[in-house]
Amino acid sequence: METTLGEIARIIKGELKGNHNIKIKGISTPENPKENTVVFCRNMEEVEKAKEKASAVVTQEEVKDFPHIKVKDVKLALAEFLEHFFPEEHPWGFLRTPASEKELEIGMGSFIGDFVVIGKNVKIGRNVKIYPFTYVGDNTVIGDNTVIFSGVHIYRNTVIGRNVRIHSGAVIGADGFGYHITQEGIKKIPHIGGVIIEDNVEIGANTTIDRALIENTLIGKNTKIDNLVMVAHNCKVGENNILVSQVGLSGSVKTGKNVILAGQVGVADHVEIGDNVIVTAKSGVANNLAPNKTYGANLPAIEWSRWKRIYVYLLRLPELFKKITT
């Protein structure tokens, strides 16, 4: 994209403070601002980060001596910006072109099974195996020696490294769960980012890894992900992680190196987990976890009649505590 700050202000119905003719060539994030881009900021801390490189910001605040567009609702403005400048494209008509007849880059020794559908501008390395009924979206890159089993769905703008194994039913790069509640209803926030899966990663059956809002959801090298794991948009999973079945990572979670999340661990959005952390099964992680420790908070099953008695006492704890302290 290439536009002006004035045109952006018109599209998102904001109040422009600065030169209308500033050239804008894209969007970036407060964490990673880039030159010639606009950044949508939720607070002044993000504004200060964005000012280091970005050409302008969109914010609810007044910003001194820096080009900005002032809006009432930053999330709504972001959704309107993405809808206008990055519209979702869909084909029309009947497309029956087999993968073998498309202009693809396919390395020596690779195999593409029956009923595989491959989009445009896809690059496939050497000795890659793609089994039947798999979908590979536009602008995807697949590294050498990677194996993709039957029925995998890989959305556009996905980068898969070397020696990766993706099992049946996995979905890579679906839209992140991003919505904003307005007076008119629930507004979808378009996701224009992608997914990067580094070398030597294994992804289990029916696992889902969502695309990022603007940049990339990342799975670090040598990480192993079990079946039925959910990785939400903007997550950064570190190297050598183990994510056991039914783990759920909310949006923008970051994990360090050598992290182990046991079965059914749930992690709240924007939480950071340090290196060498182990979280025991069924634990909920609501806050950042310091490195080199084991964490856990779960309730193992006990005899039902006993639990009901304990529960009665739990409800009386505030009353009992008050009696003890007075």
Swiss-Prot record:
GO biological process: lipid A biosynthetic process
Pathway as given in its UniProt record: Bacterial outer membrane biogenesis; LPS lipid A biosynthesis
Keywords: Acyltransferase, Lipid A biosynthesis, Lipid biosynthesis, Lipid metabolism, Repeat, Transferase
Enzyme Commission number(s) of this protein: 2.3.1.191
Enzyme class: transferase
Gene Ontology CC: membrane
GO molecular-function terms, A-Z: N-acyltransferase activity
UniProt-listed InterPro entries: Hexapep, LpxD, Trimer_LpxA-like_sf
Active site, per annotation: H233 (proton acceptor)
Reaction equation(s) it catalyzes: a UDP-3-O-[(3R)-3-hydroxyacyl]-alpha-D-glucosamine + a (3R)-hydroxyacyl-[ACP] = a UDP-2-N,3-O-bis[(3R)-3-hydroxyacyl]-alpha-D-glucosamine + holo-[ACP] + H(+)
Sequence similarity: Belongs to the transferase hexapeptide repeat family. LpxD subfamily.
Subunit field text: Homotrimer.
Function: Catalyzes the N-acylation of UDP-3-O-acylglucosamine using 3-hydroxyacyl-ACP as the acyl donor. Is involved in the biosynthesis of lipid A, a phosphorylated glycolipid that anchors the lipopolysaccharide to the outer membrane of the cell.
The protein's name in its UniProt record: UDP-3-O-acylglucosamine N-acyltransferase
Originating species: Aquifex aeolicus (strain VF5)
